[in-house]
Amino acid sequence: MDSDFHVKPEIRILGIDDSALLNEKVMIVGTVFRGGDWIDGVLRSEITRDGLDATEVMVTMIKNSRHHNQLRVIMLDGITYGGFNVVDIEELYRETGLPVIVIMRSCPDFEKIRSALKHFSDGEERWKIIKKAGKIEKLITGRNGTPIYIQKAGIGAKNVEKIIRLTSIRSSIPEPLRVAHLIATGITLGESRGKA
């Protein structure tokens, strides 16, 4: 069921991205934003590279945060973290009670993903989680007409669009994700690089 709620200009959003894949444990960083204007906090945890613990770790990180009760939405940079550690967005929504918006710069190449998953003994399980995330929709945010691609859990399309437009201030990628990416790569690599 999709949550229907009024989107306030200072809606509290948690954007989560992962760091560079340098070790067996991969850092994930969450930034708590009020709308797209300012950051209220930073969360950090670790997941297993190519593991299956991303959903559980995110749930724990969110529920144990002092920001949990203020948050209204979770934003993810895709559904695979730390290599092929797939996030079950339906479970993340169910366990945290927070709607989930997945943002992608480009539409995933499912043939390549399916092929890569053949190298995992539990590739079919991962594939089911990927397919369970639902339909990928194209959205033009108004920033240079550049499209982004989204998936969602627990939130309607109109609210997704409102939230993305509200938070996409400097690029087509919402600020909570853009800043989470900068922090995660900066901490891991010594300097931020790449695109969220």
Curated annotation (Swiss-Prot):
It comes from Methanosarcina mazei (strain ATCC BAA-159 / DSM 3647 / Goe1 / Go1 / JCM 11833 / OCM 88) (Methanosarcina frisia). This is UPF0215 protein MM_1007. Coiled coil: none annotated. Belongs to the UPF0215 family. It comes from the Archaea.
